[in-house]
């Protein structure tokens, strides 16, 4: 019964992710049994129609080893029930897979992107590198000047090769499948509220297969602890501290950047 209820609540989750959720709730259930019931009750996720993707050799960047080493940005488009279209700026930490921001508005310029990044940085600290496509917002004078003044490296993927920004491609697919295709947005404030709730759920509750089924938040906390222990061991052998303990980059609070 709980499996069916959870599958109804998480309609786009497969049996593996549902099994993780059940175990987290304290249900001692075998994964094969979950799979069998999942099939018998016809809870299987229905495949959506595919879309054309740019062809070409995948050239993924090296996997970052710490939070804030690399963020990636992208846009997703949707529309409200009255037909008005809006865009969503997605900001992802490529190491922890945390969604740092979902910014929804009818217009998102390069200057607006810069303001939203500044707001995230105030909460989380500055990234070493940001990855994006070559959209006009990301190649605007506002973004170029910001990257130069902050010292953040900005890496542009090859034109027509969205797969080179694989972290955002994967995240945007989950966002589309689990939320946007399932929700009717009545207004922009409604869309922002729903996106915020989903972002928090994604970071704090949703198990991630690439993180050993940990949530992005739990993985970030575990990784931060490992980095802290390593730094303590190094610091014990050093003449002086190697890093400022008040460095704001150690703050891993998540933030949703919203339009006022």
Residue ranges and their predicted role:
Residues 28, 32-92, 98, 110-116, ...:
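Mobile-element integrase/transposase regions
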Residues 1-70, 136, 159-162, 215-225:
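Basic, flexible linker segments flanking DNA-binding modules
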Residues 63, 148-150, 173-260:
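C-terminal domain-tail junction helix/linker
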Residues 117, 124-140, 159-162, 214-217:
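Acidic/histidine-rich, metal-coordinating catalytic segments
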Residues 3, 18, 34, 38, ...:
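Mobile genetic element proteins and their domesticated derivatives, centered on retroelements
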Residues 48-52, 129-134, 148-167, 183-188:
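RNase H-like polynucleotidyl transferase catalytic core
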């Amino acid at each position: 019964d709980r499996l069916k209820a959870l599958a109804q609540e998480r309609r786009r989750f497969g049996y593996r992710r549902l099994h993780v959720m059940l175990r987290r709730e304290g249900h001692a259930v075998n994964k094969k049994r979950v799979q069998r019931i999942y099939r018998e009750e016809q809870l299987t996720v229905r495949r959506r129609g595919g879309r054309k993707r740019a062809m070409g050799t995948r050239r993924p960047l090296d996997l970052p080893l710490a939070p804030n080493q690399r963020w990636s940005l992208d846009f997703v488009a949707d529309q409200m029930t009255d037909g008005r279209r809006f865009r969503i700026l997605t900001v992802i930490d490529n190491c922890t897979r945390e969604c740092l921001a979902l910014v929804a508005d009818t217009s998102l310029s390069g200057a607006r992107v810069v303001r939203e990044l500044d707001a995230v940085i105030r909460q989380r600290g500055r990234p070493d590198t940001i990855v994006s496509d070559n959209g006009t917002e990301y190649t605007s004078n506002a973004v170029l000047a910001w990257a130069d003044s902050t010292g953040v490296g900005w890496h542009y993927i090859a034109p027509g090769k969205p797969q080179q920004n694989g972290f955002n491609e994967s995240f945007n697919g989950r966002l589309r499948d689990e939320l946007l295709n399932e929700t009717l947005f009545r207004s922009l404030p409604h869309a922002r509220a729903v996106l915020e709730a989903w972002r928090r759920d994604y970071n704090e509750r949703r198990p991630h297969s690439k993180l050993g089924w940990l949530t992005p938040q739990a993985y970030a906390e575990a990784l931060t602890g490992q980095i802290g222990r390593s730094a303590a061991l190094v610091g014990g052998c050093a003449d002086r501290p190697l890093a400022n303990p008040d460095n704001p980059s150690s703050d891993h609070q998540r933030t949703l950047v919203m339009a006022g």
